[in-house]
A protein has these predicted regions:
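Class II aminoacyl-tRNA synthetase-like tRNA-binding/catalytic domains
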Residues: 1-71, 272, 280-282, 301
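Metal-assisted phosphate- and nucleotidyl-transfer catalytic regions
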Residues: 1-10, 82-225, 247-287
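Beta-sheet entry/capping signal
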Residues: 19-21, 38-40, 182-185, 219, ...
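A residue-level signal for conserved active-site and pocket-lining positions in enzyme catalytic cores
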Residues: 22, 66, 141, 186, ...
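Flexible loop/turn segments at secondary-structure boundaries
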Residues: 29-31, 48-53, 72, 192-196, ...
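His/Asp/Glu-rich mid-to-C-terminal helical/loop segments that flank catalytic regions of hydrolases
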Residues: 35-37, 72-93
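A generic structural motif
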Residues: 65-76, 224-227
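Active-site pocket scaffolds in enzymes
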Residues: 232-324
Length: 324
């Protein structure tokens, strides 16, 4: 910045010596802390460059992330379910519903819309407090979608298949039919569609074909909003982690060098890029663990009956817009 003229000189000098980028998740850093503490969490700003201008997407949002020591994906899902249920029950015991209904009524004529909005909140909160929430594998979800398409029970714009993943219309169908108004966990997605750090599932598809390998992960689908939480068990074995990194196109160490001491004369960035420290967490000792990330603004919008996430965030920044 230049004196009182308030002009900026733009340079190409790298402030951190190398290009660095906005944070898309704090998960990897939480994994470092869980080595010392059994349960860790953070509520942090997160940035995504998704070119999606929908009521469900913004480029900057808050995400609640947690990591725990566990060998069980069920335990991670239990934690998510109990956390959201407890939060909702406390909302029911508070006076916040009346405030939301009053705020929704402001500027509107008649009580019809307010009554409808009040019923909407009751339905959503009731669904979140029911127990237990259904859990279904990705394979079973695809089968249900394909059966529905063949029997004409549902018409999808995107044909459901193992390789193409679950589209929004598929998630809405699963949430509506399997959950019937309650949240639904979908587990064990294809390995090829998920990040490198996820632990393989304890079982594989019946035909055991390579393209049908799965990882121990889940998405939590909430009616209307759909995916709100994603989580998994993390790969804690150094050889398997580096193998997964290579298969995902990351420059991991060759197997013969995994247990070798790092060469002081060699830059770690030549071996594992910016993830050398992450591999070291496994190389020098790790334990089974898992965690999740919850889209905080999406959940707030669902609880408050707000249909567009851009109305939840005070200064929404999204694809094509960053006004302030």
């Amino acid at each position: 910045m230049n004196g009182d003229k308030q002009t900026c000189d733009v340079t190409n000098d790298e402030f951190f010596k190398h290009p660095k980028y906005l944070t898309v998740s704090s998960q990897l850093h939480l994994e470092a802390f869980v080595h010392e503490h059994q349960k860790v969490w953070t509520l942090s700003p997160t940035f995504r460059a998704e070119k999606s201008d929908t009521p469900r997407h913004v480029s900057e949002f808050w995400m609640l992330e947690a990591e725990i020591r566990t060998e069980s994906l069920q335990e991670v899902m239990d934690l998510v379910e109990e956390m959201i249920r407890t939060l909702t029950m406390r909302l029911q015991d508070s006076g916040i519903k009346e405030e939301l209904v009053y705020a929704n009524r402001s500027g509107k004529s008649g009580n019809g819309e307010s009554t409808h909005f009040s019923i909407l909140l009751d339905q959503r909160w009731h669904g979140l407090t029911q127990s237990p929430w259904p859990r279904i594998t990705y394979q079973d979800a695809i089968q249900k979608l394909q059966d529905a398409a063949r029997s004409k029970q549902a018409i999808f714009q995107h044909e459901p298949s193992w390789s193409t993943g679950l589209q929004l219309e598929h998630e809405k169908y699963i949430a509506g039919t399997v959950g019937q108004g309650n949240p639904v966990f979908v587990t064990d997605y294809p390995r090829k569609t998920k990040p490198f750090y996820m632990l393989p599932s304890s079982f594989e598809a019946a035909d055991d074909m390579a393209e049908h390998k799965t990882v121990a992960c889940f998405d939590l689908l909430i009616p209307e909003v759909c995916e709100v939480v994603g989580g998994s068990l993390r790969e804690h074995r150094v050889e398997d982690l580096t193998r997964s990194m290579r298969s995902h196109g990351l420059n991991a160490l060759p197997s013969s060098e995994i247990n070798a001491e790092p060469d002081a004369n060699t830059s770690p960035s030549l071996e594992t890029g910016n993830l050398d420290w992450y591999v070291d967490l496994r190389r020098y000792g790790s334990m089974p663990h898992g965690g999740f990330g919850l889209g905080f603004d999406r959940l707030l919008g669902y609880l408050a009956g707000i249909g567009n996430i851009k109305d939840v965030v005070p200064w929404p920044r999204h694809y094509g817009r960053c006004d302030c």
